[in-house]
From Swiss-Prot:
It comes from Actinobacillus pleuropneumoniae serotype 3 (strain JL03). Binds together with bS18 to 16S ribosomal RNA. Keywords: Ribonucleoprotein, Ribosomal protein, RNA-binding, rRNA-binding. This is Small ribosomal subunit protein bS6. GO terms for cellular component: cytosolic small ribosomal subunit. The keyword rRNA-binding applies. Pfam families: Ribosomal_S6 (PF01250). Coiled coil: none annotated. GO terms for biological process: translation. The keyword DNA-binding does not apply. One of its GO terms (molecular function) is structural constituent of ribosome. Belongs to the bacterial ribosomal protein bS6 family. PANTHER family: MITOCHONDRIAL 28S RIBOSOMAL PROTEIN S6, SMALL RIBOSOMAL SUBUNIT PROTEIN BS6M. The gene is rpsF. It comes from the Bacteria.
Length: 124
C-alpha cells in the first residue's frame, strides 16, 4: 500500500457535514485494510482567490496508507459531491504523523495567549 496526503475543501455552508464526511472517508480507508496516520480539521479559512463566488472554505487534511482502489473511490466521491469545492491527493514516500505547520502555528498562538494572560494575572 502507498502513502497519500489528501486535502479537501468543503463549501462553508456545509461545515456541519464535515465530521460525517471525515467519518465516511476514514471508514472506507480502514475497511480496505488501510490506516489513517494523520487527520486534521483546519476549520473555515479564507481562500486565496474566490471559488464559485465564495471567499471561505472548510479545510480538512488526511494522511493515509491505502490501496489504489480506495483512492479511486475517494476521488470519485470528491468529484460528485457538490459540497467539496476542491481536493488534492498527493502520493508521499512515507507516513506523515507529525502536526502540520497550520496546527503548529495555531498551537503557538494559543501558547502565547496563555502566557500573556498568566503574566497579566501575575502582575495584578
Amino acid at each position: 500500500m502507498r502513502h497519500y496526503e489528501i486535502v479537501f475543501m468543503v463549501h462553508p455552508d456545509q461545515s456541519e457535514q464535515v465530521p460525517a464526511m471525515i467519518e465516511r472517508y476514514t471508514a472506507s480507508v480502514k475497511e480496505a485494510g488501510g490506516q489513517v496516520h494523520r487527520l486534521e480539521d483546519w476549520g473555515r479559512r479564507q481562500l486565496a482567490y474566490p471559488i464559485n463566488k465564495l471567499h471561505k472554505a472548510h479545510y480538512v487534511l488526511m494522511n493515509v496508507e491505502a490501496p489504489q482502489s480506495v483512492i479511486d473511490e475517494l476521488e470519485t466521491n470528491f468529484r460528485y459531491n457538490d459540497a467539496v469545492l476542491r481536493n488534492l491527493i498527493v502520493h508521499t514516500k512515507a507516513a506523515v504523523t507529525e502536526a502540520s505547520p497550520m496546527v503548529k502555528a495555531k498551537e503557538s498562538k494559543v501558547a502565547e495567549a496563555v502566557a500573556e494572560v498568566e503574566s497579566e494575572e501575575a502582575g495584578e
